Amino acid sequence: MAGFGLPNFGQLTEAFKKAKQIQQDAQKLQDELENMEIEGKSDDEMIKVWISGNQLPLKVEVQENILNADKEKIEKNILQAIQKAHESSTTTMKERMNDLTGGLNLNLPGFDNSDS
C-alpha cells in the first residue's frame, strides 16, 4: 500500500488492465451467446425449437403428422420443447459466465462463482 491507504500505482494499473480484459471477454461472450442456436425437442420429437444463448426464440420446426393430434397434445409438445431449449440455454450461459468470472469471486446472483 502506498501512502494514505491507497494501492501503489503498479497495482492500480494492473487492476485496470484486468478490468479491461474482463470487459472485452464479456463482450466476446455476449456475441458468442447471441450467435448460438440451442435446440429443444418435445419428448416425442414432433416439435423442435431453437433459441439463442440469450434465450431469444429463433425458429420452430413442427412434424406434419402432429398437426392431426388434438390441441392439448400439440400445446404440451410445444411447451416441452420450449422448456428444454430454455433449460439448455440457461445452463450454457451460466457455464460460460462461470468460465469468464471464475476465480474473481464476484458473487454474482444466480451464478456459481466457486472454484470447486
UniProtKB/Swiss-Prot annotation:
UniProt keyword DNA-binding present: yes
**Record key words, sorted:** Cytoplasm, DNA-binding
Mainly localized where?
A: cytoplasm
Q: Which domain of life is it from?
A: Bacteria
* Entry GO CC: bacterial nucleoid; cytosol
**Cellular localisation:** Cytoplasm, Nucleoid
**Under the GO molecular function aspect, what terms does this record hold?**
DNA binding
* InterPro entries cross-referenced by the UniProt entry: YbaB-like_sf (IPR036894), YbaB/EbfC (IPR004401)
Per UniProt, subunit arrangement is:
Homodimer.
**Which family does the record claim for this protein?**
Belongs to the YbaB/EbfC family.
Q: What does this protein do?
A: Binds to DNA and alters its conformation. May be involved in regulation of gene expression, nucleoid organization and DNA protection.
Protein's recorded name = Nucleoid-associated protein P9215_00191
